[in-house]
Amino acid sequence: METVNRAFFDNYLDAWNAHDSAAVARHMADDAIYEDVALGRVLHGPSEMASFVEEATRSSSDFRFEEVSLFTAGTDYANEWVMVGTNDREVRGVPPTGRSFRVRGASIGKLDASGRIAENRDYYNLSELLMQLGISPPAPSS
């Protein structure tokens, strides 16, 4: 069984920071499950992951992750990061706010036997992100 290694995560974050959706997708197992808990989205496999990366980086030319720490135990990992960028591009007809964001978060996951991401859950404060962008968070549901 493969264990988590530093180079794998350096390459993974480099791919995100280069907005290289295909390279990010290559880090995912064919049957990977990637969950963005804040958005309530669950992605399946490399193809959906590539589309997600394109969507996530579309509104920010300088979107990137800054790693804070990486903890590993066998094939399990916890990666603390800061998501940084500027909302400087129009998306789906919505004009950019021009505001920057800096939001702390973490990824918790597991690699498969081939050393690719089998499971990943991202946690961050969506309300904090929306407030920094000058966008009101959605009203609580009843």
Give, region by region, the residue ranges found by the protein language model.
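C-terminal and inter-domain tail/linker signature
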Residues: 1-142
